[in-house]
Regions:
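N-terminal Rossmann-like dinucleotide-binding module
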Residues: 1-39
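Internal alpha/beta domain cores that form substrate/cofactor-binding pockets in large enzymes
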Residues: 2-4, 26-29, 57-76, 81, ...
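Short alpha-helical
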Residues: 10-11, 68, 89, 141
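N-terminal beta-loop-helix "entrance" segment that forms/cooperates
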Residues: 34-54
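Donor/substrate-binding cores of folate-linked one-carbon enzymes
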Residues: 80, 84-197
Length: 197
């Protein structure tokens, strides 16, 4: 499958690496480079580092308002766009381009903890379980139909980092399963529409 990958932080790394092993990643979109605290050195996102190491074409747009960029994405003829912690909301013009749509890995069991910081929210709220959700992307944030979910227990000793690391690996594996279902036209939507908690 021809895939455009969109992601930025460490959480997205296993997903890009695993997808790149099994599919054709035609380009990677990540947030713009930022200067470090002293402003002397430019820091690349973890996703950009991996994309560079794998000779993948990289885009770092500030937004998706440039018609030339939208046309360039159309010309790539992606089968699918995969989003993992990208940090930008995609407009309908982008969502409508890929043959099989756009899917997103979210680090909670939707509809619980839509939006930002779901890992923190699960720990702060004392949840006994968390997990990952793969869903279709719509214009509304974290509102698309859920394709797959996988749960994991939250222990009393759980930290943000331990749960983050477990979910990023669970999510990468679940993404591959979702892509396979999409490829075989075997997707059975689990939840038709997400609602706010």
């Amino acid at each position: 499958m021809r895939i455009i990958f969109m992601g930025t932080p460490m959480f997205a790394l296993p997903s890009l690496e695993k997808i790149n092993e099994k599919h054709e990643v035609i380009s990677v979109f990540t947030k713009a480079d930022k200067p470090n605290a002293r402003g002397k050195k430019i820091n690349y996102s973890p996703i950009k580092e991996v994309a560079l190491a794998n000779n993948l074409k990289i885009y770092q747009p500030e937004n998706f308002k440039d018609e030339a960029l939208i046309e360039e994405i159309r010309n790539m003829q992606p089968d699918l766009i995969v989003v993992v912690a990208y940090g930008k909301i995609l407009p309908k013009e982008i969502i409508d381009i890929p043959k099989y749509g756009v899917i997103n890995l979210h680090s909670s069991l939707l509809p619980r903890f839509r939006g930002a910081a779901p890992i923190n929210a699960a720990i702060i709220n004392g949840d006994k379980k968390s997990g990952v959700s793969i869903m279709y992307v719509e214009e509304e944030l974290d509102a698309g139909a859920v394709i797959l979910q996988e749960e994991t227990e939250i222990t009393d000793e759980e930290t943000f980092l331990s749960l983050h690391d477990r979910l990023k690996d669970l999510g990468a594996d679940l993404l591959l399963k979702a892509i396979e279902l999409i490829e075989k036209d075997e997707v059975e939507v689990k939840v038709k529409k997400q609602h706010k908690n």
